[in-house]
Curated annotation (Swiss-Prot):
Annotated disulfide bonds: none
Entries under PANTHER family matching the protein: EMB|CAB62440.1-RELATED (PTHR31900:SF34), F-BOX/RNI SUPERFAMILY PROTEIN-RELATED (PTHR31900)
Designated name of the protein: Putative F-box/FBD/LRR-repeat protein At3g49030
Protein source organism: Arabidopsis thaliana
Keywords: Leucine-rich repeat, Repeat
Cell wall biogenesis/degradation among keywords: no
SMART domains documented for this protein: FBD (SM00579), FBOX (SM00256)
Domain F-box: 20-68
Repeat (LRR) residue spans along the chain: 74-100, 152-179, 180-205, 218-252, 272-297, 320-345
Ranges that cross the membrane: none
Keyword Phosphoprotein annotated: no
FBD domain: residues covered: 357-408
Amino acid sequence: MEQQLKTDGLNLSIRDAVKEDRISELPEDLLLQILSDIPTENVIATSVLSKRWRSLWKMVPNLTFDFTFDPKYHQTFSENLYRSLTSHEASVLESLQLNFTRGIDGLNIGMWIATAYVRHVRKLVLVSFGDVRDKRARFRSALFNFNDTLDILEIQDYILLDLPSPVCLKSLRELRLYEVHFKDEASVCNLLCGCPSLEVLSVHRERNVDVETFTIVVPSLQRLTIYDFCIGGGKGGYVINAPSLKYLNIVGFEGLDFCLIENAPELVEAEISDVSHIANENILESLTSVKRLSLESPIKIKFPTGKVFDQLVYLDVLTKEREWWNLLSRMLESSPKLQILKLTGLSCIEKGLDGQNWNPPKCVPECLLFHLEKFLWTGYEWQRGDEKEVATYILENARLLKKATFSTKRIDLENLEKRREMLNELASVARASDSCHLVFHSI
């Protein structure tokens, strides 16, 4: 007699129940995509489901192993990881992520990475978890040698790179370093010089005291992001030599000794945030070739004397700092081809600044007379006299302005009428451009 299953009061035969296994009927590519989002140890367990699933896990292109728990599972973790890598049958291993703690020794990690290289891994992510009391996992040059398929390398947290000789990652295109320590300045150099195809570099540092001079010399580099949050206690600094660099993002430099951009003639776009109190820097001076520029801390870095931003068409200035408008004036005077001006306000603007007067440029800047077409002000503080002065000046002098947009923060009902009056005053300003469309809205 055929065994019966009872579901919701209905009799259903095992044969019919098996037919309801619709997931096994999905295309293999879709199944592999689904399995790629599941921890690899769980993926391996699917091999017992049916004959079709027996070998399917071996084709999964993205593998993630997490050893951040009890060290007593070390042996099982190692066996599963090694089994997965040696049994992998896809032509290319798209990605391998290893999350580990101090319970994993460097020899095992080296063996796993070497096996991944044999499987032509394209993306490798190494994450070491711990706290300030833990000894960092030490990686040496041999771990990153003789690979010609790796495209992306990401190294995170409690890892020390001790690289006495150059690495050899010929095809590496993107490198991400998050709170990684280096043994010395030579280790930084030996990592970067061993990546001749590197185009994208992200460096995140916090409370790092590993190297004083972080030198970035990469001829092929096109995009660079540096986050450094050594607030008030930073020593040393950065030297950047990247002749092919097109995009630069610097965040959090405060109290460093220097930041020198020695060679970056191809820069197109730059974003500078929270940069202040650097004894020796040439940041703005090195950005005169950019077409798009965002500045968050305008008054705390040197303005280049006699320099002209003659390629700049887009400028974004944050209005939170004291007398931010002084830098705005200088940027308008130095950017003859500027087409789009954006001012961004924050709720953390310093109190007690109202009543200070803005001194506009002595002569109307060339960009206002001949090029500026769009003016955006996000977080416009309608109650502040200095901001009204700046807005009025732009409207009265930008002859080709097509659209001016002012976004104000939401306010209490009791202040709605006062805000309406202030915005109506701004709307009544005699605009230099007859075709300028004025827009107000809340954010």
